Amino acid sequence: MSRYTPSEFAHQIGTGLLSFPVTHFKSDLSFDEAAYRANLSWLFSHEAAGLFAAGGTGEFFSLTPAETDRVVRAAVAETGGRLPVIAPAGYGTAMAKEYCQAAEAAGADGILLLPPYLTEASADGVAAHVEQVCKSTRLGVIVYNRANQVLDENHLERLAERCPNLVGFKDGVGDLELMTRIYSRLGERFTYIGGLPTAETFAMPYLTMGVTTYSSAIFNFVPKFALDFYAAVRAADHAKAYAMLNDFVLPYIALRNRKRGYAVSIVKAGMKVIGRSAGPVRAPLTDLTEAELAELSALVARIADVQKLAA
């Protein structure tokens, strides 16, 4: 059972940076629970406000429901209540409800509702999907506005009235006008989370629209850098934030953009660079080439000593 009411959950996840761990695989691509838990233990030495288990960076799309349950249970066990664990739900409405029920049974504290899979629907249909999922669980729900699951301020306002446990809004669209309209209409009703790939890029402008946190993929392998950047953003230290963007984030994004799917692959590559390998990605994703891995290694070395990052 969650330690948080939905409103308490919403408050907690808005207080700091959110961790978005990769899912560890063995060479045969099976889930490596021991390595996953050991890595979470290391990450806990760096302060975060919440943890997304088996999320997008955790290759949710490549996990079976049983594997997802194992990952969530491992995260719950390893965190030991130190921070909220956010479990994924996705695909069609019926499956999303089952994921929510499994998350509750596993002891997760909240739900990240990912977009439905391989279907197109009207905003009214998407809103109905979100409402049904929210009403199937007692946990606080974060809706991920992305791909084929994009809601505007009108639909979100109605959902907020009908679903008290819909407490989070994660943006993966990057439409500043839409974000402005949503925040102007809903205000503090939601906790707003940045959810674009390499969310650091959007952190400064999004802060002015109520987005107090984001899920950081680079926290996986350069946690101190990620936390320092987040602190600079929250302190409105634009000079420091832009320097950090130029030193690491923007070159990192250029490497990430080499191939579709690298938003996940490059994070696992970063883990390998610091000596904390999480294994390969599962198909249809592909790992970075050796040459690209060397480029990433040079980027990481530019910002800090690798041994200190892995200590």
UniProtKB/Swiss-Prot annotation:
The protein's matches in Pfam families, at most eight in alphabetical order, are given as: DHDPS (PF00701)
Please give the start and end residues of each transmembrane region.
Answer: none
Task: Could you list this entry's UniProt keywords, alphabetically sorted.
Answer: Lyase, Plasmid
Reaction equations catalysed: 5-dehydro-4-deoxy-D-glucarate + H(+) = 2,5-dioxopentanoate + CO2 + H2O
Enzyme Commission (EC) number: 4.2.1.41
Signal peptide location:
none
Q: Which SUPFAM superfamilies match?
A: Aldolase
Please state which protein family the record places this protein in: Belongs to the DapA family.
* HAMAP family in the cross-refs: KDGDH (MF_00694)
Stated name of the protein: Probable 5-dehydro-4-deoxyglucarate dehydratase
Organism the protein comes from: Ralstonia nicotianae (strain ATCC BAA-1114 / GMI1000) (Ralstonia solanacearum)
